[in-house]
Design a protein with these regions (language model features):
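Hydrophobic alpha-helical segments, chiefly the membrane-spanning helices
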Residues: 230-231
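Domain-scale activation on soluble regions of proteins
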Residues: 33-39, 70, 148, 158
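Carbohydrate-binding/catalytic loop surfaces
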Residues: 1-13, 59-81, 129-148, 179-195, ...
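Long, well-ordered hydrophobic secondary-structure segments characteristic of membrane-embedded
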Residues: 9-59, 79-90
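Aromatic- and glycine-enriched pocket-lining scaffold segments that form the walls
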Residues: 89-95, 103-198
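Conserved small/polar residues in nucleotide/adenosyl-binding loops
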Residues: 219-226
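Well-ordered alpha-helical scaffold segments within catalytic/enzyme domains
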Residues: 19-34, 84-100, 157-168, 202-213
Length: 231
């Protein structure tokens, strides 16, 4: 929802956008808008393009020119966007695995995805002293940004989960994320930095939530408050 939406075309895209585009292809197939052969072919074309993109220690840069495929200045690696992209790669990998008999080279693309995931080193975005992820890495300045994701209710939650699962960062990072509770209109949940649906709900595109869990609790809180705002 945007209150002051501006319609215009920009010749750039981000790592999150690239990953979401892949997931959109899968969603289009699941909803019957596209056939499996066209969907697999489109995903293969997108993966081919990703392999051509310049990267930093396996990470996609935050923004690319869609015509030249060159990274846009200033060159920056976003922790959130990298987490999103790798998360969506796992979805694409699973989708191709389920349909790996349709094309002879599907296994080759699964191998490419595995390599992309493996080469994305999240440890370089992690601050060991605080046990938190930095906002990102300024490649031009060759340093981590001195701001950190310290809340569990954050759009960086997926990046944290994936980095731990890849063993790029220690499990104790998860317990370092703040879990301060709040209550509004009968709903309880965790606080985020700015209370946006983006912070609470973006990771839920991929991450499963279980009934009675803290994740479901703060998801309901955010959904209720968003509904109240729009009424």
């Amino acid at each position: 929802y945007q209150e002051n939406r501006k319609n215009k075309v920009v010749n750039r895209t981000s790592s999150t956008n690239i990953g979401l585009a892949m997931v959109a292809v899968i969603s289009a197939y699941d909803m019957g808008f596209e056939n499996i052969y066209a969907s697999v072919k489109l995903l293969q074309n997108m993966i081919d393009t990703v392999t051509k993109l310049e990267k930093w220690n396996g990470h996609l840069y935050n923004w690319y020119d869609i015509k030249t495929l060159a990274p846009l200045e200033p060159r920056y690696v976003s922790t959130v966007d990298s987490g999103n992209f790798v998360g969506y790669l796992y979805v694409v990998k699973q989708f191709l695995t389920e349909h790996n008999r349709l094309y002879e080279n599907v296994e080759d693309y699964i191998a490419i995805i595995n390599k992309l995931i493996e080469q994305t080193d999240f440890s370089l975005l992690y601050d060991n002293s605080s046990r938190l992820f930095s906002i990102g890495f300024d490649v031009n300045e060759n340093k981590l940004t001195d701001s950190y994701y310290d809340l569990l209710a954050s759009e960086a939650r997926q990046a944290s989960f994936i980095a731990i699962s890849k063993k790029d960062v220690p499990v104790k990072h998860w317990s370092s994320l703040n879990r301060t509770l709040t209550a509004m209109n009968g709903y309880k949940g965790l606080i985020s930095w700015s209370g946006t649906a983006f912070e609470y709900l973006m990771p839920n595109i991929n991450m499963k939530s279980y009934h009675g869990s803290l994740s479901v609790s703060y998801t309901h809180l955010r959904a209720h408050e968003t509904d109240q705002y729009l009424v």
